[in-house]
From Swiss-Prot:
Gene3D superfamilies: 3.40.50.2300, 6.10.250.780, Nucleotide cyclase (3.30.70.1230), Transferase(Phosphotransferase) domain 1 (1.10.510.10). GO terms for molecular function: ATP binding; GTP binding; guanylate cyclase activity; peptide receptor activity; protein homodimerization activity; protein kinase activity. This is Retinal guanylyl cyclase 1. Its main location: membrane. Activated by GUCA1A when free calcium ions concentration is low, and inhibited by GUCA1A when free calcium ions concentration is high. Negatively regulated by RD3; RD3 inhibits the basal and GUCA1A-stimulated guanylate cyclase activity.
Length: 1109
């Protein structure tokens, strides 16, 4: 293209370009001849026309991952696009049209960069072919429409024409759907390669298939892209819903796709290539593979892959006989349209797809101009005419409002050639036999088929079941439902009974669950019918001293290790528990509050021991046991001093318990001080709630209550015995008021009236006058006495609710907590504060020690490894693609050790390694270990740093070498300390080894080579391998190296090695390597450098060993 300024749409600015021809123009070009009018009118017309109207060159951009995907690059897009443009420009039919030029545009392989590539491309071209990444398709459509550029996508499943966007070059989704419909394979799974391009293609394809009604069961990614990742992906397919076909969204193995090779090999290993699944490659839909006698090398070289590929069906573009991609490539090369040195066997068939896309775009331009009479046309007009354009494609005629035909290719397990089985027309959805049937693995049939309803538009498929089977199943379900309805009632009650008599939530208790105790003194019958006062007076030690007894009708026992109380039902002929009783008790068992006694179960047992008559059946409610007895008993014990705080605490507990019951809609009906019990913490709890309801459900006749029991009963209940049995909420409030009188006065109800219980009950039942207790004003706060009298109101509606009573009572106590143990808590508050301060100090000391421990641990192991070991999680070995290792040792260390005391050797190494440790702190390196005089450092692990590892190690080595030049031993300062340094770069594996004193160790040939570089080095020299030198030169940071020459490395052979002698800008002094005498050792110290006294000592210790040196 000429050097003209480009405007939007990629067309030249008419003010800067001199067009070659004006009679015919590309899209947007009016084809009128020069206007024979005054120059001013012509200039005005030129300024009013769009810029693209004045261009004689139509630039086609071909966008794809040519630079980052080698298989796409093998399509030689530059040659394909130029070949198409050259043929278009030579076409006589297009002589009056624009000149076509092509430009190759790179598309990143990662999704985040695709949109930027599209945006950049639209500003440089008149028409665009691409993008490849489906994630950029929709944004590309919008950007192309805004820029007025015709867009021809070639790899966007589900893309519809519209605006400036033409239909996809290859209808991949339509063709694949037609194939699945022909074989009735509705349930499919998609496995994609891990690259962004294929992941997005899988998502777009699954959305397109689901939009057509197919149940895509799974879309998964093969990560990592090796055999292990393939196995995991196939296991997910196995574990998911049943599928018929697996669509492989990745490069075909026939083009060198390693992911598909691993996937097919894994399928063969897992037994999935046996015909139970069919594997369909996705990428072959975008180019043409042709059957023929030529053997496929990738199948011929691997018998396992050949067997696995037998389960693959390839749907690809159809080429006419003699017109395959390879045939056309040969003809183009023979006509010198392609370079003669081009290896056609290495060219991907995607070559033809690129060629066809450029021709389709050119055909759309020609038809659009023809329809406009040679006048100006927009990008949308070009895109609209592309489907109708009929052009000679690279593999047959394209366009003409018909989708290209496809062919279904197959192989067999014994051969390595492709043969055609069916011809597929996506437009009609027809499948015509090509003469050879499909060969399924092991000679079996297809992997089955799904109901045809999946492929019928507007029909909701019933999970893959035929309608007749659905109707039959419906009748069967109805029949089973009717049969089950007769069993449901029985099974429900049976299961409920099982749950009640077994398991952790059972409520039916027997002699196996409850252990009864015979109390000291008194007969059995007396204990059963007595109050809780006799049991409350017993100590724990007294109860535990009594041996276990058989059932003796006692009211106390042991259940699951806790004391329990049994409230016995009247009568002794209880054989079974009625279902209504179980239901009622289950609801009562759900009541849980700190001031309500917890019901644990229903005890049903038959006696024969303990004096009970044969056939006797005991039924009782088992509840938690409160050791201090009832409130009535507590008030009767005069040796217990009760102040107002104690009394208010008891009353507040009673009010809270009753408020909870009323909130749950439970009317007590039998509330009295004998039904209020106190536990060992002096917490009052309400008991016997719902007892009348249980009696009624069990159909037990209640004996008429005595006058003494009716002293707490409200007047309206005394007048209605039926209402008295059920109880009411206002009646409970009246009973509460009587209990308040008991607690305040510490006397029996109505004790101050000097009347018998019968007389009191009669006067309360039949006023006037009203019969109520009399309470002195000095016995309680005035507000409490007024609240008490409100509870005694004759009319039920005038009595306050429990919520109102609770609020009033709290105001009487001015919001203070009145629990009896609060006093003891206040006494411990000061001690608690002091204890908190002490704990805080100890915690701070512990945190300091923990920090010290963590600091020490991170000095021994990498922080990530240290954290994993502290958490107790295993540390998996990690592979590092490229690191640089440093090895160094002290020249003549054995001689120095022989001349030194052990403590002097330790001091030497400590001083030297302390110097090294200070230096490595300023570099991005990790100290691996020290063994004797050997010092090992690595960079690039455990934290990767790109290629910086070589520079970090090289800088550190220069710093260490400079520092060693001025280092002196404390015990032999006149003896120089010379070190040898070896560097090498390469891959390695790092991991933690051992459980006791675990070490972070490195493994691999890189470690051995780095050690060999050190051992073959020279004093005061940094010996560097070619791998490290290559990285240092790539970093271009001015590192200076010298060629040492060929060096024999143990186990590696002779290699070219180098000396690292400096770096640009490195001004620190570096010690001069000593001159080597012929025949002298490179790995020791000469005797002339050893002081006489030390030399004499060494000769004395090893006579004759150094005499010749």
């Amino acid at each position: 293209m000429s050097a003209c300024a480009l405007l939007a749409g990629g067309l030249p600015d008419p003010r800067l370009c001199a067009p070659a021809r004006w009679a015919r123009s590309p899209p947007g070009v009016p084809g009128a001849p020069p206007w024979p009018q005054p120059r001013l009118r012509l200039l005005l017309l030129l300024l009013l026309l769009p810029p693209s109207a004045l261009s004689a060159v139509f630039t086609v951009g071909v966008l794809g991952p040519w630079a980052c995907d080698p298989i796409f690059a093998r399509a030689r897009p530059d040659l394909a696009a130029r070949l198409a443009a050259a043929r278009l420009n030579r076409d006589a039919a297009l002589e009056d049209g624009p000149r076509f030029e092509v430009t190759l545009l790179p598309e990143p392989c990662r999704t985040p960069g695709s949109l930027g590539a599209v945006s950049s491309a639209l500003g440089r071209v008149s028409g665009l072919v691409g993008p490849v990444n489906p994630a950029a398709c929709r944004p590309a459509e919008l950007l192309a429409q805004e820029a007025g550029v015709a867009l021809v996508p070639w790899s966007c499943p589900g893309t519809r024409a519209g605006g400036t966007t033409a239909p996809a070059g290859t209808p991949a989704a339509d063709a694949l759907y037609a194939l699945l419909r022909a074989f009735r394979w509705a349930r499919v799974a998609l496995i994609t390669a891990p690259q962004d391009l294929w992941v997005e293609a899988g998502r777009a394809l699954s959305a397109a298939l689901r939009a057509r009604g197919l149940p895509v069961a799974l879309v998964t990614t093969m990560e990592p892209s090796d055999l292990s990742g393939a196995r995991e992906a196939l296991r997910r397919v196995q574990d998911g819903p049943r599928v018929r076909a697996v669509i492989m969204v990745m490069h075909s193995v026939l083009l060198g796709g390693e992911e598909q090779r691993c996937l097919l090999q894994a399928a063969e290993e897992l037994g999935l290539a046996d015909g139970s699944l069919v594997f369909l490659p996705f990428d072959t839909l975008h180019y043409a593979l042709s059957p023929g006698p030529e053997a496929l090398a990738v199948l011929a070289n691997s018998s396992q892959l050949r067997r696995a590929h037998d389960a693959v069906l390839i749907l690809t573009r159809h080429c006419p006989p003699g017109g395959s991609v390879m045939d056309n490539l040969r003809r183009a090369q023979e006509h010198q349209e392609l370079p003669s040195d081009l290896d056609l066997q290495q060219v991907s068939p995607f070559f033809g797809t690129i060629y066809d896309a450029v021709l389709l775009l050119a055909g759309g331009v020609a038809r659009a101009r023809a329809a406009a009479g040679g006048g100006w046309v927009s990008g949308a007009t070009v895109a609209h005419h592309i489907p109708d354009a009929q052009v000679p494609g690279f593999c047959g005629t394209l366009g003409g409002a018909q989708e290209p035909p496809f062919v279904l290719l197959d192989t067999d397990a014994a051969g390595d050639r492709l043969f055609a089985t069916y011809m597929l027309d996506p437009t009609r959805g027809s499948l015509l036999s090509a003469g050879t049937p499909v060969h399924f693995p092991r000679g079996g049939g297809t992997p089955g088929s799904d109901p045809s309803c999946w492929f019928e538009p507007g029909v909701i498929c019933n999970g893959g079941v035929e309608p007749g089977l659905v109707f039959l199943g419906f009748l069967l379900v109805v029949g089973m439902g009717l049969t089950g309805a007769f069993l449901a009632h029985y099974l429900r009650h049976r299961l409920l009974h099982i749950q009640m008599v077994s398991g952790p939530n059972k409520i039916i208790l027997t002699l196996d669950d409850v252990t009864f105790l015979h109390p000291h003194g008194g007969s059995t019958r007396k204990v059963v019918q007595g109050s809780r006062s006799s049991l409350a007076a017993r100590s724990t030690s007294d109860i535990r001293s009594v041996p276990s007894q058989p059932l003796d009708n006692s009211n106390i026992g042991l259940f699951e290790g806790d004391w329990v109380w049994l409230k016995k039902f009247p009568g002794d002929q209880h054989i079974a528990i009625r279902p209504a009783t179980k239901t009622a008790f289950s609801k009562l068992r759900e009541l849980r509050h700190e001031n309500v006694v917890l019901y644990l179960g229903l005890f049903l047992g038959s006696g024969g021991a303990g004096g009970s008559a044969a056939g006797e059946g005991v039924l009782a409610v088992v509840s938690e046991h409160c050791a201090r007895g009832s409130l009535h008993d507590l008030l009767a014990q005069r040796d217990i001093k009760l102040d107002w705080m104690f009394k208010s605490s008891l009353l507040l507990d009673l009010i809270k318990g009753m408020r909870y019951l009323h909130h749950r809609g439970v009317a007590h009906g039998r509330l009295k001080s004998r039904n209020c019990v106190v536990d060992g913490r002096f917490v009052l709890k309400v008991t016997d709630h719902g007892h009348a309801r249980l009696m009624e459900a069990q159909r037990v006749l209640l004996e008429p209550p005595s006058a003494e029991d009716q002293l707490w009963t409200a007047p309206e209940l005394l007048r209605d015995p039926a209402l008295e049995r059920r109880g009411t909420l206002p009646g409970d409030v009246f009973s509460l008021g009587i209990i308040m009188q008991e607690v305040v006065c510490r006397s029996a109800p109505y004790a101050m009236l000097e009347l018998t219980p019968e007389e009191v009950v009669e006067r309360v039942r039949s006023p006037p006058p009203l019969c109520r207790p009399s309470v002195s004003m000095d016995q309680a706060p005035v507000e409490c006495i007024q609240l008490m009298k409100q509870c005694w109101a004759e009319h039920p509606d005038l009595r306050p609710s429990l919520g109102h009573i609770f609020d009033q009572f709290k105001s009487i106590n001015k919001g203070r907590k009145t629990n009896i143990i609060d006093s003891m808590l206040r006494m411990l508050e000061q001690y608690s504060s002091n204890l908190e301060d002490l704990i805080r100090e100890r915690t701070e000391e512990l945190e300091l020690e923990k920090q010290k421990t963590d600091r020490l641990l991170t000095q021994m192991l990498p922080p990530s490894v240290a954290e994993a070991l502290k958490m107790g999680t295993p540390v998996e070995p990690e592979y590092f693609e490229e690191v640089t290792l440093y090895f160094s040792d002290i020249v003549g260390f054995t001689t120095i050790s022989a001349m030194s005391e052990p403590i002097e050797v330790v001091d030497l190494l400590n001083d030297l390694y302390t110097l090294f440790d200070a230096i490595i702190g300023s570099h991005d390196v990790y100290k691996v270990e020290t063994i004797g005089d050997a010092y090992m450092v690595a960079s690039g692990l455990p934290q990767r740093n790109g290629q910086r590892h070589a520079a970090e190690i090289a800088n550190m080595a220069l710093d260490i070498l400079s520092a060693v030049g001025s280092f002196r031993m404390r015990h032999m300062p006149e003896v120089p300390v010379r070190i040898r340094i070896g560097l090498h770069s390469g891959p390695c594996v790092a991991g933690v080894v051992g459980l006791t004193m675990p070490r972070y160790c490195l493994f691999g040939d890189t470690v051995n080579t780095a050690s060999r570089m050190e051992s073959t080095g020279l004093p005061y020299r940094i010996h560097v391998n070619m791998s490290t030198v290559r990285i240092l030169h790539a970093l271009d940071e001015g590192f200076q190296t010298e060629v040492r020459g060929r060096t024999e490395l143990k186990g590696k052979g002779a290699e070219d090695t180098y000396w690292l002698v400096g770096r640009r800008g490195f001004n620190k002094p570096i010690p001069k390597p000593p001159d080597l005498q012929p025949g002298a050792s490179n790995h020791g110290i000469s005797l002339q450098e050893i002081p006489l006294d030390r030399r004499w000592k060494l000769e004395k210790a090893r006579p004759g060993q150094f005499s010749g040196k």
